Each structure stands twice: as C-alpha cells, then as structure tokens.
C-alpha cells in the first residue's frame, strides 16, 4: 500500500476531508470546514477523558496489545502471587560522611544530599502535594542534578499504588546480553559450529538440520542457556519446567500439550551428549591453562594477535575498561504505527502477526475494501518494540520472578567466591561491589545466558482483558493524584490538550527487570519531564547527567561509537577459519540462519518509504527511535568533564527526571516500576529546542508544540497559561501569515483540505505547525511546511511555477499542490483573539458573524465532541444579548452551570462518604453484625440521572469525566465481580464488600451481597458449633454467650434460606433446652432456706449443660461442679458408699459389639459424664486397691495411645464430626452439583481463599492444602493432570490406610475395654470416643445401606456416589478397610478406560501422594 493510499485511507476512516478552491491571498473563507480527526468512539469527548468502565480504572485501551494467556493447569482460585512474598534486594552505599540536610525554600521542606548523589526528599504520603506542583517547586534542583528523588514513608499498605493484577499480568521480554549484537552473534555461531563438529566428527553421527517446532526452527543456543540456568537437563525434567522453557523460547500456548515432549526430545538428542563433552573438555583445559587464558579463548577481537599484542596498553584499557556496548538495552521512543509507515520508518507491528490466508492477506473471496491492518480503525495503534520478535520470551509475573531468582542464584554461584563482600548478604548488596561486578561482566562477557528484561511495556498489558484493577483497588486509590496513570492528563499537564497522541505520551509504561537488567543512557522524548515509581521488588541503581552537560555527553557517545567501530568492528570467531568456512557451507548453518531470522529484531522491520526519487527531493536520515546502547564506566564520564550523579531507587520511591537529563538504570534484583510523562507549563521553554533535537537525531516527532498551544488556548480556562501560550505562538503566527501571503502571491489558488494527520515535514522531519503543503507526484507524495515550500518554489521565464524542475500545474497534471490546515478559521479566531499584529489577517478571517463561526465549529472541530465551556463564554460575551443566537447560547450555558453545581455536590458527597470508610467489623461467633447498605438507592439513582444529563450535555466541563467515570465503574463493578457474588467464598465476599463501600451501587446489589455474606457467616458459626461440636463454654464469652445465642437465632431467621430450616431448628432446640434448664434453676432459687435442693437435680442441670453444650459461663458451671464434687468427697470421707451404674454394662457391651446404635441410650453412664460415677484416675487416693485399679487404667491408656494416637485424635475431632456428618452435607447427584454443591474436597469445607485443583476423573475440587500436607505444587504444564487418590489407577495403587488415624474396629475394642475400668480418664476423653463411635457407626450403617446389597457392592450404585462416601471417610481419617477395599476396586474398574485414554494420549498423571 503506497503512502498516498495510507493517507487517503486514514483520513477517510477518521474523517472525510473537505476540499475547497479558495484565493489564498484573501485568507481562508469563513465557511471552510475542517476534517476533524478525533480518534474517540461516539460520546467520547477526547482521549484524555475516561470513556469506559475499565478505562475508568486505567486510562488506556487494550487495542494494541494482546495478553499472552496460555492454557494453564486447571485450578480454581490459584494460589495468589502475593507481593509480600517477594524477596527484594537493596543496594547499600558506605556513606561518605553524614548526608547533608538542606532546607528548600520553595517547597518549605528539607532534603538530604550526599556527594555525587541527587537531592532526596523523604515525606509521609499524607504530606504529598500535587505531583506536578511538586515538580515545578523543585525545578531549580532538577536543572542542576537532572533528577530529584522522592521517598515515601511506607504506610500500613505499602502496595497501595500497585495498580496491576500480579496474577494476570503477561508480557514479552527482550533478551539483554553483556556485549554488542555483533559479538553476541559471534558467540552463537561459534556454539553452532562446535555443536556441528561434535556430532559429525567426534560422535560420528549425522546432524544436517536443526529441528523445527510449530513451523519455526528451534533456537538451540537459547534452549541450552535456559536449561543450564535451571540446573541442567535432569533438573528441568524433575521439576517439569519444559513448558516454561517453551514460553521463554517464545512458543505460543496452543502447542503446549506437545511442546514439553518435543523440547525434551530435542535436547536429549542434540545437546545432552554435547553438554557432557563440553564439561569434560573444560575440566581438561582447567588443568592446562589458568582462568585468564580460558576466558580469552572464549572471546577474541578482530585484530590479529600480533597487532593486539603491539597495541598500546593504555588504548586497550580505554576501550576494554571504560566504554562498553550491551545488547538490547536501548531506550525506545514510541510512535503510531501508521505514521511511521507513511513516513517510511521501519515498523514492527505486522512482523509479529501470524500469517493467515484470507484474514491477514486478502484473497479472491475477500470483500472489497477489506484491510487487516485497519481492523482497529479509530484508535491510536502504536508500533511494537523492535526488540519484540516471534521468539521473544513470554512470562507472567510469577514466572518472571522465579526466573530472576534462578539468574541471581547462578551469578552468586559463579562469582560468589570472587566477590565475597558483594554476596555476603543476599538481601543487601554493597553498591561499589555491585558496580564493579557489573562492569567486569561487560568487559569479560562470562555469562552464558541472557538477562530477560521488559522495558517500556505498554500499560495495556494489565488492562481490562486480564481483569486487574477494578477487582483489586478501591476507587479512592484509583483517583489518587499520585497514581501515575492520572499524571499525564493531570489538570496541570498540557498533554490533556493533545488531539492525537502520536507518541503514547498520555499512557504510562512499565519496566520489569531482574539482576543486571539495564535501561541504557537516554533522554526523555521531546525533553518531557517524567516520573518513575518503583512499585515492587528490588532497588535500581540510577545514573544521571546534569542537563547542562547534555551536549558534552552526546559528544562522548559519538566518540565512543567512533572508537568502538574502529577498533572492534569485526569480531573474530574462536572456531578456526577452515572449520568455520566448512561449517558455513552446510545445511545445518542454513538452518541456523532460519532460526536467527526469527529471533533477530533487525530483520523484522517493514519499510514502506513513500518518497520522490532521490534526485527530486532529498529525503532525511531515518532512525527507528532507539537510543544508545553504550555503557560508560562512571569514572570515565567524570574524567571527561561531565558531572555524573548516582542514586538508588528503592521500592516505594519516585524519581523525577527533568528535561535534557540523560539517565541510565541497572537492577539489583526483581523489580516492577512504572513511568509517566507530563508537560507542565515550564516545559514550554524547552519545547522548541526539543523539536529541533528530535529532527537532528532523525527521530519522528511525537507532537507539534504549535498545535498544542492552540488547543490549550481553545480549551484552557487558566489565564496565566493562556497568556504564556499567546506569547509563545505570536511570532510563529506572524511568520506563518507572511508565508501564507507569499504563497498567495506566487501561486494564487490552491486546494485546501482540513485534517489533523501527518503534519510532519518529509524534508526536515520537523512538525509543520498549523498547516502543511502536500506535493503529489503521481502516486507519491511529500509533506512540507509552508516555509519550506516557499523556499523551494522556483519561477522560470514562462511564468509557470515549478518545484524541483517539475511544473506545479502542467497539462499532464504530474505535480499537484494542496494546502492542509489543522484548524478552521473560526477556531483560530477564538484561540488567537487578542493578537493585534496585522499579518495574522492572512491566517484567519476577522469576521464578526459569530453564528457562522458557531456553525463551522459544530460541523468541524466539535462535530464528534463537546464544546469547552470557555468557548461558549467567549461567544456569549461577543454577541448581542438580544439576538436569538445569544439567548440560545445563554440558555445552554445556564443549564450547564446548574448541572455543574449538581455534579460538584454529588462528587463532594461521594468523596465524603468514601473517605469515611473504615474496615468493616463482620462480627464473630454468635455476635454477628448486620451489614449496612452504605450507599442508598437514592445516591445510585442520582448518579444515573446525572450521567444521563451529562451525556446529553453538549458543553464540556471539568466535573463531567468524573461523573462518567463513576457511573461506568458503578455499572461495571457488579459485572466484573459476578463470579464472586454468585460463589460461596466467604473471604472473597468480605473483601468485595469492603471494596464496594467506595462505589455508589444499587440497593439490589447491596442486598444480594450482604444477605449472602450474613448467611455464610451464620452457617460458618453453625458448622463450628453444631457440626464440629466445639465446646462453647471454652470459647470466648464475648463471642459465645446465652444472650448472644438469641441474637444469633434471629440473625439466622433473617438471612437463612429455606434449605437451612433444619439448622435453624437445631438452634431453636438448643434455646428451648436452655430455657428448660433455666426454669429448673429458678425453681431452686425460689425455695426458702430450710428447703433442700436434690443433688440429682443439680446433676441433671450439669448433665444438660454438658450433653447439649449450652453456652453457660464457665464460672457458673465450675461452681455447680464444685458443689457436687465436694458433696461426693464428703460422702467418701464418711464411708458413704456411692453406687456405680454397673447394671447396664452387659447391655451396652452387647450393643457395641453388635454395632447396634441403640448403645447411645446407656452411653451417659459410661462416657465420663455426670451419670458415670466412676472416680477419675487423677483423683487416685493411693490405697492398695486403687493402685491395682490405676495399673489397669494405665494399660488401657497405653492401648488408647497406640490405636488412636490420642494427641492427633484430639486435633482432628472437628474434622471427624464434619466429615462423618450426613445431615448438613448430604449426597448431591452429579447433575445437580454445579448448582447445589457448596462443600468440597476430603475436608468437606466450602470453597475458601486457598488454591483448589480439580480431579480429571471425578471432577471434584480439592484444596491444595489438603493434598500431600499442602506440598502439592500444580505444574503449569497442561500435559500434567491431577487425579485424586480416590481415582488413582491400579498401577499407582496407594495403601488404603494412607491418612487413616484409627480403624472403627479398634475404636470399638477401646470402648468395650473402657466399660470395665474402675478409674476413668479426665473428661472429655471418654465422651469424645463414644461420640465419634456413634457418628462412625451411623455413617457405616448408612453407607452399607446405600452402596451394598447382601454384603457386596451394589453394581447399580454410581461411582459418583461411592466416591462421595470414600471422600468423606478419607477426610475423617476413620478406617473401614473391609468396606473401602471393594468400593475402591469397583471404582478402579469403572475408571480404567478414562485412565487409559489419558495415558495413551501422553498425559502425565500426578496424585499428590508419594508413590
């Protein structure tokens, strides 16, 4: 597609141009129309405003970035990657004295400064001013040091500003290395040559081509370096890391099922033996040569050995020790893809697009006009990084952090002995030693792996597509002025007035790095100030050059490049010339070139230069926007008379970078930082110089200052800013008007087009300003500024005007000239009102017909956007108040003022409510809290009403985007969190409720959310007390007391569902029992003093308290118990015989042996309760008989410990009762599980905040914590599948007693033996044993009834039902071996076919249980 077609198509998509014939000398006609090029969707006022629910959180779009989401291991609620778990590294510098503390008069604050460092302000977050105001106040310091550091004293939540979802952030990294691209290629070619020679000459095998995976030649060098970094082939196989290594090789998720196998096979076949051979060779060389000789063998330069030896030592040292080149560290300037394409710059966007016939490339069946490159028309699409290729490694944040740890470990292992002081503590690194090692690596190139780094990553990587901030952060944090997403479009930033963001200035970028990740020396795009915030992880070392030394430093870079090119221009291979020549002729080398082409970013660019022949109009040198890859040793910079400053950027600190300041940064470990650019009014004095520098460097301009000034005059209400803009643009307007006059005099009539695209000169690469001349020659065209065109005009004798020898209008029409204007005359008239210089009359028409001006504005500039309030005010003040036009304007203006007041009032109310939000107390135990509906329906309705009014209002005002943003957030928030609301995860629901308090939501939302939370809270308490049978009297009385039991019951009546009626009945029964007991107590208290209270009545009261676990205060219970115990002791002292209940021993013995549940009728007489009159072993009197009885008791107690593991038995009691419960956790048929199931796993708990994993066979979800003692780590390889121990295939048979604490038969024997004891253990040991046996017996009987017929497994029983019972048994740790064995075998037979299908298809099965 030609450049002319590009312009036509873009102009047509964005807005159809309006062509006119006018007389230039008479100025622009007042009715001229402008082709407005706003890129927003309908109802979207401008790119600086928030236009959707998602962009209300992140001011970006997802249109030019695809998250690299791949098939992951099937899991529910994967264990979150918590920022708190990240091991960060800090750089520490030995202080050269105490840092000076200096008072800064403009800010009224103190800052600290050390020698060779930058000013550092340390403030609490509540003391922070507006970021741009702070920048303006410290500009005097920034102009001297280049940077200013602001360190925030961390508050309770130090990750408040972390506006990314760390679990869903995916990105492509660039591969950085410690030498130049040329030398890196030399190393790689040497590797392939050695590998080829090894296979063909040493191993005597045939190796002709490199394997291909997914239609791409495998990068063996990268594969080997990744595997070696992870510990080698065996370690990667053991840890199942092949899928991750595949991502690091840039392979996509759709082939992950076969990728691991392919990579493993390729490595074993080609590289494994080579690794062993290399290790043996290295060991042999180590015996013969010292380490320096080994290192010099790895890397040699192009000069001959003799010359290298003869070269002066000081010259070698200068290059080798002071000036270095590091691959892929270059900082890049972002530009719109289509502008780069039109201007002939290399583009990289399409090179990453997968070819698909009929989609990416048209065919005969393709509809007319279809063009894949414009599938996202109407949006700013930025070109991809030149370092992003099809082989770029893909990471999520967790995987990248793990890779950074592996890199850190590898470097420590290699250099720890040489740098003992550096790695003495892994959490802190001495700065000087850190720098020394870094520059040592640059000079010696000892590292065999790349440093994968993400530089300038678009903020769209954490966009709505991966569901980030709306679920993570309260709106008060989103609206925080120090949230970097808000800074580019801050009210004090001129970037808010951009029509078209050609350079991604209004969106933030991210850097993600590890140890020795580097961003090379660079100056900010267009000298714009920037702010960098280190969100997470380790410290960065930041170098900065003072702005006044910018030219000196650029000269140093140029000199370094010249010397580098002269001395190290042609690296030499370590492979001999004959071997290399032979290797280059092989098919293996050609296969390597195929792999190199996919990985080499220099070959991915797509150029489409749209130009005249070189002899017609000279073109300009084009650059791709990358800055230098040179690294200088700090002392070398200082020695060249350049001031260099250093600082460290820790987590939670900001670095302000000032215009013309060169900076460079190096990471000390894993970090994630964010960068934002902004344009304060003070930047305007650098804007002209920045434009010239951009043109001189051959970079594509990112903005036009003159266009920005006019937009500021049109849209800003700030009188100071408006005056500054007028002063700055006045000279340009005069010059433009004079050139317009000359053009009219020389040519007369030209075509005029109004549009807003490509106002960049093809000759100088400078912005053309408010107008441009488009010279078209056939299908080609060139843009020139009006000034450039006038200079190029020639006038031969015949009077015909020509340019470069081609007539402007000859009869053949070879050359045509068209004038394009950025603004219409009406808009210019408003913007330039007040400029009284006569030449401006050639630039605009001073026509006082404001009604016509209004019509022009409505049909051009503001056709798809709202009108700024100041323009309406201007038109009202310049028109007759008696005209209909004025009355119409004033009516709209007055309505807008009323609407503005309503919006202000609503925003103030909303902010007051949001700021008053505190942590919610949900209550505990029986003391549960009714949750308030924070925002009334009235507030949500008011917001909706305001939104409708604001949306229909045609006038733009500052409160408008806030209302739109709030409305979209309130609408989208319930949708984004629907899964949480519909689920039963109480922790997530509570967290959601807390977040919701800062959003005006409908009452229907609040009602549903609060009702669900309250119900789940109630059920959680019910399970703790009534199912797990916890003793209430041992609980905190502030949470569990009798008065609170009533409120707990009322709470349940309000919030429970119909399915909870049985549970409410149990609570009611407990209350009635309490009332009955209290009635008995009242009867005791009413008796007169002579009356006596029966001891049996007191015992009945205590028995009820124990049996029903009534929430009686422990002091009351202890006092009653004390009275009874004292009476019994008195009887003993008086030789009064206490009759023990021995009559029913034979009955209960027989019932227990027969597994008859009727034994519970007699249990209270033998379970250590009040009715069990046997003395406690702890009260042994010491008589001979008592000693014999004590001996029998101890034997029984030992037997109990052996069988029941008494201590563990007490710990698992709640889970036994919970898992053996068949009332509240009833069997749910398979077809109803998706709707009705609320309890999962062996533990039979609800879906909690911990990670869960699904069994591939039974489809049950299991908590990871419940498998292998929580040590199961689900791999991210989808080839590896989890199968629970119940579905485990026969070949992986697991001992059935795995996890069993006791067998039912053993428990029965213990109970039978306890019946004959004369001394019993302290309560509640016996009671727990009897209760557990009753539950287990009931469970066994029910299971036999449901699953067995005549002692055999019922073949009609579904495996789903059988596994339900097996699952509960395993969770209870109670063994029914004679029943579970046949049930497991039955399931294994049923599951055999499914297991076979999985294994036959290459799936790897894990159970989470050691084999």
From Swiss-Prot:
Residues 118-159 form the JmjN domain. Residues 476-695 form the JmjC domain. CDD domains: ARID, PHD_Ecm5p_Lid2p_like. Keywords: Cell wall biogenesis/degradation, Metal-binding, Nucleus, Zinc, Zinc-finger. The keyword Cell membrane does not apply. It comes from Saccharomyces cerevisiae (strain ATCC 204508 / S288c) (Baker's yeast). Residues 185-279 form the ARID domain. It is found in: Nucleus. GO terms for cellular component: chromatin; cytoplasm; nucleus; Snt2C complex. Residues 285-312 are annotated as: Disordered. One of its GO terms (molecular function) is DNA binding. The keyword Glycoprotein does not apply. This is Protein ECM5. GO terms for biological process: cell wall organization; cellular response to oxidative stress; chromatin remodeling; regulation of DNA-templated transcription; regulation of gene expression; response to oxidative stress.
């Amino acid at each position: 597609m030609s450049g002319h077609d590009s312009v036509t198509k873009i102009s047509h998509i964005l807005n159809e141009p309006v062509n006119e014939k006018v007389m230039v000398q008479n100025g622009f006609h007042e009715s001229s129309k402008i082709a407005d090029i706003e890129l927003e969707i309908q109802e979207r006022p401008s790119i600086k405003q928030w236009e959707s629910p998602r962009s209300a959180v992140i001011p970006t779009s997802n249109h030019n970035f695809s998250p690299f989401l791949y098939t992951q291991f099937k899991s529910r609620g994967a264990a979150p990657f918590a920022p708190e778990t990240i091991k960060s590294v800090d750089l520490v510098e030995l202080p050269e004295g105490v840092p000076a503390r200096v008072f800064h008069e403009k800010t009224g604050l103190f800052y600290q400064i050390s020698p060779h460092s930058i000013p550092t302000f340390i403030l609490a977050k509540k003391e922070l001013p507006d970021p741009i105001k702070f920048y303006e106040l410290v500009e005097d310091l920034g102009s001297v040091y280049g940077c200013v550091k602001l360190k925030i004293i961390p508050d309770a939540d130090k990750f408040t500003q972390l506006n990314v979802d760390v679990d869903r952030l995916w990105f492509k990294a660039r591969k950085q290395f410690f030498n130049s691209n040329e030398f890196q290629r030399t190393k790689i070619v040497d590797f392939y040559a050695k590998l080829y020679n090894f296979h063909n000459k040493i191993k005597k095998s045939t190796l002709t081509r490199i394997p291909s995976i997914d239609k791409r030649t495998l990068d063996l060098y990268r594969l080997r370096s990744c595997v070696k970094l992870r510990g080698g082939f065996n370690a990667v196989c053991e840890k199942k890391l092949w899928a991750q290594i595949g991502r690091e090789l840039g392979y996509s998720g759709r082939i992950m099922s076969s990728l691991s196998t392919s990579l493993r096979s390729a490595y074993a076949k080609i590289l494994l033996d080579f690794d062993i051979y290399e290790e043996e060779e290295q060991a042999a060389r180590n015996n013969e040569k010292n380490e320096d000789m080994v290192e010099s063998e790895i890397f040699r330069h192009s000069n001959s050995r003799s010359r290298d030896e003869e070269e002066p030592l000081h010259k070698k040292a200068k290059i080798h020790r002071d000036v270095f080149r590091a691959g892929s560290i270059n900082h890049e300037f972002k530009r719109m893809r289509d502008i780069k394409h039109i201007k002939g710059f290399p583009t990289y966007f399409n090179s990453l697009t997968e070819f698909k016939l009929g989609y990416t490339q048209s065919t005969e069946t393709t509809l007319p006009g279809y063009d894949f490159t414009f599938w996202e028309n109407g949006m700013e699409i930025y070109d991809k990084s030149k370092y992003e290729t099809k082989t770029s490694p893909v990471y999520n944040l967790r995987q990248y952090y793990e890779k950074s740890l592996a890199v850190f470990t590898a470097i420590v292992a290699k250099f720890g002995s040489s740098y003992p002081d550096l790695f003495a503590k892994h959490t802190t690194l001495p700065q000087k030693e850190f720098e020394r090692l870094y520059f040592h690596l640059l000079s010696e190139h000892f590292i065999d792996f790349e440093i994968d780094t993400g530089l300038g990553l678009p903020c769209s990587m954490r966009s709505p597509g991966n569901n980030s901030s709306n679920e993570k952060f309260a709106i008060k944090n989103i609206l925080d002025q120090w949230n970097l997403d808000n800074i580019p479009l801050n009210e004090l930033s001129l970037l808010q007035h951009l029509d078209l963001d050609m350079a991604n200035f209004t969106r933030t970028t991210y850097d993600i790095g590890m140890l020795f990740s580097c961003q090379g020396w660079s100056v900010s795009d267009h000298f714009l100030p920037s702010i960098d915030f280190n969100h997470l992880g380790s410290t960065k070392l930041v170098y900065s050059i003072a702005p006044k030394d910018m030219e000196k430093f650029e000269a140093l870079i140029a000199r370094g490049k010249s010397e580098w090119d002269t001395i190290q221009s042609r690296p030499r291979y370590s492979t001999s010339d004959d071997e290399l020549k032979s290797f280059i002729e092989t098919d293996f080398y050609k296969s390597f070139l195929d792999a190199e082409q996919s990985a080499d970013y220099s070959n991915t660019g797509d150029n489409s230069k749209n130009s005249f022949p070189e002899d017609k109009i000279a073109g300009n040198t084009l650059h791709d926007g990358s800055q230098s890859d040179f690294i200088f040793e700090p002392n070398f910079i200082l020695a060249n008379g350049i001031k260099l400053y250093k600082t460290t950027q820790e987590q939670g600190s900001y670095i302000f970078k000032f215009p013309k300041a060169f900076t460079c940064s190096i990471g000390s470990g894993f970090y994630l930082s964010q960068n934002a650019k902004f344009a304060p009014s003070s930047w305007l004095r650098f804007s002209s110089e920045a434009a010239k520098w951009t043109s001189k460097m051959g970079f594509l301009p990112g903005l036009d200052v003159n266009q920005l000034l006019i937009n500021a005059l049109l849209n800003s209400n700030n009188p100071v800013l408006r005056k500054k803009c007028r002063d700055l643009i006045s000279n340009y307007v005069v010059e433009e008007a004079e050139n317009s006059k000359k053009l009219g005099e020389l040519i007369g009539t030209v075509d005029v087009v109004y549009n807003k695209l490509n106002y960049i000169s093809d000759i100088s690469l400078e912005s053309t300003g408010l107008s441009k001349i488009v010279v078209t020659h056939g299908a080609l065209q060139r843009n020139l500024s009006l000034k450039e065109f006038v200079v190029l005009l020639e006038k031969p004798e015949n009077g015909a005007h020509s340019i470069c020898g081609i007539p402007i209008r000859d009869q053949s029409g070879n050359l045509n000239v068209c004038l394009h204007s950025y603004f219409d005359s009406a808009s210019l008239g408003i913007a330039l009102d007040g400029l009284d210089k006569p030449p401006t009359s050639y630039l605009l028409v001073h026509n006082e017909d404001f009604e016509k001006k209004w019509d022009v504005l409505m049909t051009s500039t503001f056709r798809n956007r709202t009108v700024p309030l100041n323009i309406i005010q201007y038109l009202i003040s310049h028109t007759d108040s008696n005209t209909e036009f004025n009355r119409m304007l004033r009516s709209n203006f007055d309505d807008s003022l009323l609407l503005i007041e309503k919006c202000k009032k609503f925003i103030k109310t909303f902010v007051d409510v949001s700021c008053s939000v505190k942590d919610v107390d949900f209550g505990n135990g029986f003391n549960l809290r009714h949750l308030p509906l924070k925002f009334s329906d009235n507030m949500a309705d008011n917001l909706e009403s305001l939104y409708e009014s604001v949306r229909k209002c045609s006038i733009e005002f500052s409160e408008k985007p806030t209302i739109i943003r709030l409305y979209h957030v309130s609408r989208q928030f319930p949708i984004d969190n629907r899964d949480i609301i519909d689920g039963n995860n109480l922790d997530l629901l509570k967290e959601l409720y807390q977040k919701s308090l800062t959003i005006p939501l409908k009452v229907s939302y609040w009602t549903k959310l609060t009702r669900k939370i309250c119900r789940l809270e109630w059920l959680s308490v019910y399970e703790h007390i009534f199912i797990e049978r916890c003793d209430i009297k041992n609980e905190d009385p502030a949470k569990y007391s009798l008065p609170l039991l009533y409120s707990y019951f009322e709470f349940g009546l309000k919030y429970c569902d119909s399915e909870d009626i049985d549970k409410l009945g149990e609570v009611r029964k407990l209350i009635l029992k309490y009332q009955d007991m209290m009635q008995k107590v009242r009867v005791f208290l009413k008796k007169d003093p002579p009356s006596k209270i029966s001891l049996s009545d007191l015992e009945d009261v205590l028995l009820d308290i124990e049996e029903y676990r009534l929430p009686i205060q422990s002091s009351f219970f202890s006092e009653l118990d004390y009275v009874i115990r004292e009476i019994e002791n008195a009887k003993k002292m008086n030789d009064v015989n206490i009759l023990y209940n021995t009559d029913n021993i034979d009955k209960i013995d027989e019932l227990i042996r027969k597994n008859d549940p009727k034994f519970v009728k007699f249990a209270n007489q033998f379970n250590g309760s009040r009715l069990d009159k046997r003395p406690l072993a702890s009260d042994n009197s010491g008589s001979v008989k008592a000693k014999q009885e004590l001996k029998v008791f101890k034997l029984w107690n030992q037997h109990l410990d052996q069988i029941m593991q008494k201590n563990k038995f007490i710990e698992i009691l709640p889970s036994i009762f919970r898992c053996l419960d068949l009332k509240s956790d009833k069997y749910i048929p398979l077809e109803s599980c998706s709707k009705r199931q609320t309890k999962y796993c062996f533990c039979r708990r609800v879906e909690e905040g911990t990670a869960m994993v699904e069994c591939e066979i039974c489809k049950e979800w299991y908590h990871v914590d419940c498998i292998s003692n929580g040590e199961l780590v689900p791999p991210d390889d989808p080839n590896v599948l989890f199968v629970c121990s119940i579905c485990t295939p026969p070949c992986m048979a697991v001992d059935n007693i795995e996890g069993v604490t006791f067998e039912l038969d053993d428990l029965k024997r213990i109970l039978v033996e306890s019946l004959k004891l004369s001394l019993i253990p302290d309560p509640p040991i016996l009671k727990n044993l009897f209760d557990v046996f009753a539950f287990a017996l009931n469970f066994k009987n029910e299971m036999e009834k449901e699953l067995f017929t005549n002692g055999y497994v019922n073949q009609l029983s579904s495996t789903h039902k059988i596994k339900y019972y097996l699952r509960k048994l395993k969770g209870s740790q109670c063994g029914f071996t004679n029943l579970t064995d046949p049930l497991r075998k039955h399931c294994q037979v049923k599951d055999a076919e499914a297991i076979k299908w999985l294994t036959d298809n290459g799936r790897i099965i894990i159970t989470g249980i050691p084999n």
